[in-house]
Curated annotation (Swiss-Prot):
HAMAP family: Glu_racemase
Name the record gives this protein: Glutamate racemase
Signal peptide feature range: none
The protein's Enzyme Commission number: 5.1.1.3
PANTHER family recorded: GLUTAMATE RACEMASE (PTHR21198:SF2)
Amino acid sequence: MSRPILVFDSGIGGLSVLAEIRKSLPHSDYCYLFDNARLPYGELEEQVLIAGCVALVCDLVARTNAMIVVVACNTASTVVLPALRANLSIPVVGVVPAIKPAAQMSKSKRIGLLATPGTVKRHYTHSLISQFADDCHVELFGCSELVMMAEQKIATGEMDMHRLADLLAPVVAAQLDVLVLGCTHFPMIQAELQQVLGAGVTLMDSGAAIAKRVVTLLTQQNFIVEQRRVTNEREAVGESAMQAFYTKAEISEGLTTTLIDCGFSTIERITTTN
């Protein structure tokens, strides 16, 4: 395994970000770390969240010799990034809600942000709105239950559409033309969200922008030279190495199947003392 790209989230939402990165770097090696023992992150005290994330990520970076870390979690990105960057010598990329492109795309100038309550209430989010959407009416919707519904869908293939419609009723009533998906879990249920909200609402997430940032940073750090070498080798054999790591005592058979279908050949539980 060459130096991997490490993607980190509390659950399976980061798979949506990993998929976007793989479109740009299809022959790279990847590690996916999901801290499902502490899901959802939005309900944790900030210092507890920071200590746990730093311990987990730094341990796995040392173990795998990762060349970049992607924090594919909006909650962790607003809380943990400074501590991770202080403890790591490699680039660390976070997630930024797509407020700016949403404001630029909106014709009605009525946009919304659907995220966890933690992301909705943080000063960073309101700063983005003030900076990039001051000409828009912005509605904020915080919902942790959608995170667990996305996890449930991936694990079982099932989605309670009646409950989803109830949760999205305030979004429908707001009469928006663009809705920002401010949690990386939400692209995993984008089809269901679109079904409830209708074709008149454009859904936007940050996956493509994150992938672009990863490529830029790898280029600046000269890691892209290594990536080209790996690409040439992988084109000959037609595969890349994919490893998944989780923190819960066990994961469901359905989730294991999903990870295998995504290309992960190694699925392993890891623990930390923090």
